[in-house]
Amino acid sequence: MAAAMETDEQQRIRFQLELEFVQCLANPNYLNFLAQRGYFKDKSFVNYLKYLLYWKDPEYAKYLKYPQCLHMLELLQYEHFRKELVNAQCAKFIDEQQILHWQHYSRKRMRMQQALAEQQQQNNTSGK
């Protein structure tokens, strides 16, 4: 019952700690570290990962700087994925895929922004 009576300060600290931890899950090397030390075999830790799924709610997700952490959190719900993370090659593969995603995402986003800017410029000149 005492745990339900958190002060505002305790709630703020818990929010910050959970936010930081969830974002750490975006790092495949950190996931490999956790797997090699047996955290993913601990039932209470796996339950904690399940509890953290509330971060997928837009009310909380808006605070995330690394949204790919939510995808990793989702994958961590699967035992097979947790077991594979012990292998450093698995973490390396995930890391490489994230880099490729961001490289292509950045280029695509830049092209989209340029096209939007050109369209706005055309609209401004044709509207005069």
UniProtKB/Swiss-Prot annotation:
- Annotated localization: Nucleus
Pfam families given in the database record: Med31
Q: Which UniProt keywords apply?
A: Activator, Nucleus, Transcription, Transcription regulation
InterPro entries given for it? Med31_sf, Mediator_Med31
Molecular function GO terms recorded: transcription coregulator activity
GO cellular component labels: mediator complex
GO biological process terms held by the UniProt record: regulation of DNA-templated transcription
| Assembly and oligomerization | Component of the Mediator complex.
Q: What does this protein do?
A: Component of the Mediator complex, a coactivator involved in the regulated transcription of nearly all RNA polymerase II-dependent genes. Mediator functions as a bridge to convey information from gene-specific regulatory proteins to the basal RNA polymerase II transcription machinery. Mediator is recruited to promoters by direct interactions with regulatory proteins and serves as a scaffold for the assembly of a functional preinitiation complex with RNA polymerase II and the general transcription factors.
The record's similarity note reads: Belongs to the Mediator complex subunit 31 family.
The identity of this protein, by name, is Mediator of RNA polymerase II transcription subunit 31
Q: Which organism is it from?
A: Xenopus tropicalis
